[in-house]
């Protein structure tokens, strides 16, 4: 079974490897602002990104890109940004867990 040190190493590796975030409008990907990557009190790695498109649009996906340029996480959303919205906050939570298989 993994030790607490191993779990901490996995969490910190995720923190180090997430390099940027993107969102998609239609079929076009745009970079968004990566606000923070933290380990919460519940030992969840939380990655927050802020989307500011500048004009009304419908955002249909968000994703996280590793420092190697690989997509590490992606999720479908359906958020309409109107003129009254300045930005959209999205986050990904990663819970590292172990289970024993008999």
Task: Give short role names for the model-derived ranges.
Residues 1-63, 67-102:
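Small cysteine-rich, disulfide-bonded extracellular modules of the LU/uPAR three-finger superfamily
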């Amino acid at each position: 079974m993994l030790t607490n040190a191993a779990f901490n190493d996995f969490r910190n590796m995720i923190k180090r490897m997430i390099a940027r975030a993107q969102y998609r409008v239609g079929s076009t990907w745009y970079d968004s602002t990566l606000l923070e990557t933290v380990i919460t009190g519940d030992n969840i790695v939380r990655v927050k990104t802020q989307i500011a498109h500048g004009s009304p649009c419908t955002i249909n996906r968000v994703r996280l890109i590793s420092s190697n340029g690989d997509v590490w996480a992606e999720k479908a959303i359906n958020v309409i940004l109107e003129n009254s919205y300045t930005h959209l906050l999205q986050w990904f939570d990663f819970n590292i867990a172990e289970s024993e298989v008999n």
